[in-house]
Amino acid sequence: MSDNQPNQNQNTESDASPVAPRREFLTKAAAVSAGTAGATLMPRAVRGQEPEDGKLELVRIGIVGLGGRGTGALNDTLSINDKVQLVATADIDPAKQNVLGRLERKFGEKVLVKGGKNYVGIDAYKRVLDDPDVDVVLLTTPPGFRPQYLLDAVEAGKHVFAEKPTCIDPAGYRTCLEAHDKAIENGTAIVTGTQYRRQTNYIEAVRRIHGGDIGEIIGMTSRYCSNGIWYRNRKEGMSDTQYQLYNWMHFIWLSGDQIAEQAVHNIDFMNWVMGGPPESAYGSGGRFTRPDDSEMWDSCNVDYLYPGNRLVSFKCRQIPDTKSDNSNIIYGSEGIATVYGINRGAIITDRTGKELWSMKGDIGTAYQQEHKDLVDSIRAGKPIVELKQTAESSLTAVLGRIACYTGQDVKWDFLTEKSELNLFPENFDFNGSRPEPAHAVPGATKLI
């Protein structure tokens, strides 16, 4: 759970303080007791609770966020991995624990938490991080809280699976870089939910592209367009904050807008193909069909300029009754590669259209593979740490959002070196009020 949205009266991309309220709130919300903290500064294998070779036999899992994505992540890791066990959960909503019975019926002894270590509340995540029985924590809350949760998990000595995006503002990006470096120092793993990097047709297509099958990369187009997204009506008795957490996709301080929360998959693929993040972004878009209190735009069109003067034209859209398209087309000096989302596969042709290679896709296996890679790397004593690349992709999405919101040509270096944008509310109160939903206006919304 995390991020904040433009204040219409202030004409800025956020009404939040540019300082660091995210860390201050989360630190105050759940201070670690000295005794527990001392027990969790290092991974369990390092603390001598497992075989001398440092390899974990039973990998014990905790999760923060039991919504749809969290439940999906649990199904994936419990399905693909042997000798794993869910031992602790956290969520702000006690009703979310209803999923545990279904998981127990499906996975049996792999699920131990029913009636056990199930923590509820805004600070419940700390109880999972403080638990010495937890080796791996899955971070699957709305994105706004993710940067600080990541850093706290690493500081608690946990291995981490973190959903995308890992940040939705420059402040969160810097927190992610700090967590990345500390994980390497600690010897703890961080695997992220960018499943295209584990989908076989994507992997093979990129290998061939980088191997020269289409010649020199000239440019690219990418589309992440669908028919809409869920919306939840406010329930009687909810505070402003409770409602926004419940309907989190539609508030920028929590989701980062669709370009960050949803379309980051294609943006991550763009960076993968191009070898890193872009230099700048220039974009436009707007709101046409969203409910009045939704801060999300339903369309963004961004031109990303990558090193070597290579342009990537990116589009994301969520409008009912429109044509869906999830595709990436990479233009080379000698050929063209088209890589489709979900299960449609990939194809490479020469400049005349003659097929040179093709491959079917299977996204289902990719969802599970990321969890297998995480656990395998832990057991092998070679923990994967991939947070930096996902943080860069997440900030690339933020770069596009800010370019659209402000109407300016926004530089990567500005976000990484100068921007003070921090979207987390300065005074977070679970039972309190929030500013009226605000909508960015290009030309009026300012860079921070």
Where are these regions (language model features)?
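ADP-ribose/adenylate-binding Rossmann-like module
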Residues: 157-169
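Short catalytic-loop micro-motif centered on adjacent basic/acidic residues
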Residues: 88, 138-139, 160-163, 190-193, ...
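Active-site beta-strand termini and strand-to-loop segments that position acidic
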Residues: 303-308, 331-333
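N-terminal glycine-/serine-/threonine-rich beta1-alpha1-beta2 phosphate-ribose binding loop
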Residues: 2-158, 175-187, 445-448
